[in-house]
């Protein structure tokens, strides 16, 4: 949420050919081509105004709807008060209907800052009667920021999350702090005969602490513990979240041969400013939660996404399969978010991702536990009638590359690349021994994304600086060239693997089947979208492409 200083999973559903925006009570659908500068098609954007953190994510089991709320200033394309929760709904986590402002702060000089949504099935709060289906008893837990105070408030909905009533005895949690925000609440079942209760993770931001509270009714909260000065601190903690995540196999710190449980707890903490790439970043800790205290399995700092534009991750409450963990993040960075060259909206969300814990071989001699990410999209609809292009078993030469020309480019596509480095004794003498893919604009090929792998550096790179948009040249925080470790997917065959989604002005890269991820925005001129892909290397026969498949999305 806005900082304040006191100083690949296919889902059945509707076609994603139109993002249906509804705002200010107007039910007229607005297509993604109505707006300027290449609005994304499969990443949610507000119809107009400013957006940042995702809030209040939940699944309505009665209507089979996914609900997304978000930090929203409808009056401008920069952050400002009054700040609301915007609201969008989807059947398939791909095509969204935007309902505009849903929950507000109550005064023009205040903000309804970030928070979460729970379903109060058993009416522990006393807000509901039998007229409200238990599956739709939505309660928002959020931060009211007004003047020097930040405190936790609750509001409830009697119509399935479209409108809200504020609790008359707010605030429910106030510690007399100006930096106390972003509550994430979940239900924790009791153990050993104890009753279940609500658990809140909330940031006391500028003392670098996540506080854990418990409550029987969402109104009265008791401090249980804190998680303080862990990981990468930056300038402050924000947007904490605690969730139990399933895994295939996890390396535990005891090296015990005993059988392991089928899940572990993951604590998310976002920091801004002060991320290792500059500005915003989200980290996570793997561990155990006993109902009062979170204990990490080790002292590592793990980052959820290695790109520049992935912040304030929040997970959904009440997924259809309770073991599944889905989440979404804000796809921007506070270093330049308010200057990004889009209009009449500013900012997009990431794709929804499904998270699991997996063993990950960072080198041939060791393995570690990481949070694996898989994009969640309605692939059946997106790939229907979409055009696919393929290259197989191609050894790249320095004289002749490969070129793919996209028919009727939409700007939204997926690609999957598997390649090997063939090796050479004198390759270290080459200044930059790269395999490069140039994703070029269809109307002006002087605007392009360049991405690929360089063997001497042992990393994948992205260059997003080749554009005529002044913002990209003038804002020095909009880092042009970025690198991320691209792990070998198979140390025996030396195969590298990367899956990518490009959507108008955002690219998400999933390395080693999602064990490493990088999300970054980029900006081309209006109506100049990816229309051609060139594959090149300056070093003869250093790389072989086992397969490269590109599919344009049906949007």
Swiss-Prot record:
GO terms for molecular function: inulinase activity; sucrose alpha-glucosidase activity. The keyword Cell membrane does not apply. Pfam families: Glyco_hydro_32C, Glyco_hydro_32N. InterPro entries: ConA-like_dom_sf (IPR013320), Glyco_hydro_32 (IPR001362), Glyco_hydro_32_AS (IPR018053), Glyco_hydro_32_C (IPR013189), Glyco_hydro_32_N (IPR013148), Glyco_hydro_beta-prop_sf (IPR023296). Residues 17-23 form a propeptide. Its main location: secreted. Substrate binds at residues 50-53, 71, 113-114, 181-182, 238, 334. It is found in: Secreted. SUPFAM superfamilies: Arabinanase/levansucrase/invertase (SSF75005), Concanavalin A-like lectins/glucanases (SSF49899). Has both inulase and invertase activity. Belongs to the glycosyl hydrolase 32 family. This is Inulinase. It comes from Kluyveromyces marxianus.
């Amino acid at each position: 949420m806005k900082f304040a200083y006191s100083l690949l999973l296919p889902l059945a559903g509707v076609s994603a050919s139109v993002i249906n925006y509804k705002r200010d009570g107007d039910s007229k659908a607005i297509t993604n081509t109505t707006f300027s500068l290449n609005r994304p098609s499969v990443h949610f954007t507000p119809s107009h105004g400013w957006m940042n953190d995702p809030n209040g994510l939940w699944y309505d089991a009665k209507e089979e709807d996914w609900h997304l709320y978000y930090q929203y200033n409808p009056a401008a394309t920069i952050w400002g008060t009054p700040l609301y929760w915007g609201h969008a709904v989807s059947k398939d986590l791909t095509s969204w209907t935007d309902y505009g402002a849903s929950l507000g702060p109550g005064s023009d000089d205040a903000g309804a800052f970030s928070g979460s949504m729970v379903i109060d099935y058993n009416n522990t709060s006393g807000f509901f009667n039998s007229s409200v289906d238990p599956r739709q008893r939505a309660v928002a837990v959020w931060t009211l920021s007004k003047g020097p105070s930040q405190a936790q408030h609750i509001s409830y909905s009697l119509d399935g999350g479209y409108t809200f009533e504020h609790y008359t005895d707010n605030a429910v949690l106030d510690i007399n702090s100006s930096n106390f925000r972003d509550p994430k609440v979940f239900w924790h079942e009791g153990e050993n005969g104890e009753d279940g209760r609500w658990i809140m993770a909330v940031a006391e931001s500028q003392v670098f602490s996540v506080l854990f509270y418990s409550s029987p009714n969402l109104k009265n909260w008791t401090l249980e513990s804190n998680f303080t000065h862990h990981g990468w601190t930056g300038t402050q903690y924000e947007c904490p979240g605690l969730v139990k995540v399933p895994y295939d196999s996890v390396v535990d710190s005891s090296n015990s041969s005993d059988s392991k449980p089928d899940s572990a707890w993951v604590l998310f903490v976002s920091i801004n400013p002060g991320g290792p790439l500059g500005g915003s970043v989200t980290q996570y800790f793997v561990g155990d939660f006993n109902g009062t205290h979170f204990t990490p399995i080790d002292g590592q700092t793990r980052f959820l996404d290695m790109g520049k534009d992935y912040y304030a991750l929040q997970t959904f409450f009440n997924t259809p399969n309770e073991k599944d963990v889905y989440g979404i993040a804000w796809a921007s960075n506070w270093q330049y978010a308010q200057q990004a060259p889009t209009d009449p909206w500013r900012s997009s969300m990431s794709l929804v991702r499904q998270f699991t814990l997996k063993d990950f071989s960072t080198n041939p001699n060791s393995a570690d536990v990481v949070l694996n990410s898989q994009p969640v999209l309605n692939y059946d609809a997106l790939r229907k009638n979409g055009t696919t292009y393929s290259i197989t078993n191609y050894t790249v030469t320095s004289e002749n590359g490969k070129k793919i020309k996209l028919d009727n480019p939409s700007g939204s596509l997926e690609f999957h690349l598997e390649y090997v480095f063939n090796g050479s004794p004198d390759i270290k003498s080459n200044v930059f021994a790269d395999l490069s893919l140039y994703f070029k604009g269809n109307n002006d090929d002087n605007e392009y994304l360049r991405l690929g792998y360089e063997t001497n550096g042992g990393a994948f790179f992205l260059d997003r600086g080749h554009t005529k948009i002044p913002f990209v040249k003038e804002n020095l925080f909009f880092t042009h060239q970025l690198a991320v470790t691209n792990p070998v997917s198979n140390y025996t065959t030396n195969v590298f693997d990367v899956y990518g989604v490009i959507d108008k002005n955002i690219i998400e890269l999933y390395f080693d089947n999602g064990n490493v991820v990088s999300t970054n925005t980029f900006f081309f001129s209006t109506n100049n979208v990816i229309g051609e892909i060139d594959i090149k290397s300056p070093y003869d026969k250093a790389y072989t492409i086992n397969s490269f498949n590109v599919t344009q999305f049906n949007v």
